[in-house]
Amino acid sequence: MAFNVTILTIFPEMFPGFLNYSLAGKALEKKIWNLEVINIRSFAKDKHSTVDDVPYGGGAGMVMRSDVVGDAVDSMLSVHKNTKFIYMTPSGTKFNQNIARELLEFPHITILCGRFEGIDQRIIDAYTPYELSIGDYILSGGEPAAMVVLDACIRLLPGVVNNTDSITEESFNYGGGVLEYPQYTRPEQWKGYKVPEVLLSGNHKKISDWRQKQSHVITKKRRPELLSGEINDKFT
């Protein structure tokens, strides 16, 4: 069964964007995943296609209107009643590899991409989307964040990556969720740097032990919370 995605955005021309290239693009051509893009501006109430307004209580920026966004959501739900509805927001649960895997369990997901100062809170209250963040920083809109989420999901789909070992041995999958070990290829020497001898030995046990040790060292140095389990890795 294909992985089906609907995007709600005021910039439909941004999609599929970089998802139209490389592995994700080929998978889209093969219909391993399907993309539908809905233009929120189509549900605007005036001739200027206005989707935002000033915030009640004052403050900087503009807020996306609940009536406009709500009509777009209602239109989507009339077709995709069992979709998993997601809203990209910096205040959401931080996205990770486990969430990417769990998203694939849903036959259809919908991602709402905000702009300006975000969406009217009543959209969240009325539809209770799963609020998702890709990190502790601010983008101009939810579209790039949505593409990041989708790229992480798509590459896990069967038939997208030819060599499945490429997935199982990379960061957050390898060795119980730690960071990946260093990789080397030809030439054996470059600018005075040599490939570690163990990787040239042909001894698979020693190579495996070296890689596990390197993964542990790198993870302990850069992401110790992955070793301690102090990370929210569940999609709820």
From Swiss-Prot:
Subcellular location: Cytoplasm
Catalysed transformations (reactions): guanosine(37) in tRNA + S-adenosyl-L-methionine = N(1)-methylguanosine(37) in tRNA + S-adenosyl-L-homocysteine + H(+)
GO CC, any one term: cytosol
Similarity annotation: Belongs to the RNA methyltransferase TrmD family.
PANTHER family according to UniProt: TRNA (GUANINE-N(1)-)-METHYLTRANSFERASE (PTHR46417:SF1)
Main subcellular localisation: cytoplasm
Organism: Wolbachia sp. subsp. Drosophila simulans (strain wRi)
Transmembrane segments: none
Protein name: tRNA (guanine-N(1)-)-methyltransferase
Single GO molecular function: tRNA (guanine(37)-N1)-methyltransferase activity
UniProt keyword RNA-binding present: no
Assembly mode: Homodimer.
SUPFAM superfamilies reported in the protein's UniProt record: alpha/beta knot
Function (record text): Specifically methylates guanosine-37 in various tRNAs.
Top-rank taxon, per record: Bacteria
Gene name of this polypeptide: trmD
UniProt-listed Pfam families: tRNA_m1G_MT
Upper classification of the organism: Bacteria, Pseudomonadati, Pseudomonadota, Alphaproteobacteria, Rickettsiales
A biological process term (GO) from this entry: tRNA N1-guanine methylation
Record-linked NCBIfam families: PRK00026.1, trmD
Chain positions recorded as S-adenosyl-L-methionine binding sites: G114, I134, G135, D136, Y137, I138, L139
